[in-house]
From Swiss-Prot:
The lineage of its organism: Bacteria, Bacillati, Cyanobacteriota, Cyanophyceae, Nostocales. SUPFAM superfamilies: Periplasmic binding protein-like II (SSF53850), Winged helix' DNA-binding domain (SSF46785). The gene is rbcR. It comes from the Bacteria. This is Probable RuBisCO transcriptional regulator. Gene3D superfamilies: 3.40.190.290, Winged helix-like DNA-binding domain superfamily/Winged helix DNA-binding domain. Residues 23-42 bind DNA. Keywords: DNA-binding, Transcription, Transcription regulation. Signal peptide: none annotated. It comes from Trichormus variabilis (strain ATCC 29413 / PCC 7937) (Anabaena variabilis). InterPro entries: LysR_subst-bd (IPR005119), Tscrpt_reg_HTH_LysR (IPR000847), WH-like_DNA-bd_sf (IPR036388), WH_DNA-bd_sf (IPR036390).
Amino acid sequence: MSDLPFTLDQLRILKAIAVEGSFKRAADSLYVSQPAVSLQVQNLERQLDVPLFDRGGRRAQLTEAGHLLLNYGEKILSLCQETCRAIEDLQNLQGGTLIVGASQTTGTYLLPKMIGMFRQKYPDVAVQLHVHSTRRTAWSVANGQVDLAIIGGEIPGELTESLEIIPYAEDELALILPVFHPFTKQETIQKEDLYKLQFITLDSQSTIRKVIDQVLSRSEIDTRRFKIEMELNSIEAIKNAVQSGLGAAFVSTSAIAKELQMGVLHCTPIDGVVIKRTLWLIFNPNRYRSKAAEAFSQEILPQFATPDWNQDVLKLVQKKLVVNVLDAAIPNTSDDG
């Protein structure tokens, strides 16, 4: 077969249909007409001489050949993106793109500060921040869609061998109360006092809520006895609800610095209990790393790491993250080790 039987655009269309589940939604996501999408798929099936979709059901289902082409197609598209970014790097940070991933709390309260510092130094580098669940973010790093990420949740077990996972910072979680709550007059409260509060929480599947449950359990506090007033879907909504007097909540201290300074929320320590979780820096050591990612990792990341881990982060990043195209493609035959 001398000529390739497909184009990059056709691979993008195939991927969009697989993700969206229908030709129409795929067309909408690609900003093209549905007939154009259908025609490209028909041409692709004719060129390959195999059906790629089972059109019998309500949802467009890939055939075995469709799954096979999608698997290779995603790798081809990813490699094309890496190639473009490697060429951009020839401009020596006078352009290019840095793509950073984050889970909800780190993406809302930590990464914007880091990106702001980076942009001041490298204003010509475009920066994208992708904020999703820990699981989705980890997969994005593994697939090469994101250069690196800082997350607070549990990384999927199937990815632990393919990712470099570095303990990056400690995130302290605090109990916040309305400023007019009686407990604000006390220097600390006791564990038993928690059972008297009405709590506002994230949903039961959220990472932070699971961490809080685990840490409190180690301190012999049974969160199953907590009175849950309401469940909300964002930290900002929880802060506003507490500020309005609807209940108490546990949130990251990074999320309440402004409110504490303004005096609109109160942080009350629990006697003998400190709630901390580890934030993780993750990246794929087998993927090409742009100069923008190297600069961000070496110049910005160490400034926000927990002091005890600062040097470890810097050493690991310098050792692991500086990977160029030749390193990724050609085995090292030198004697440098």
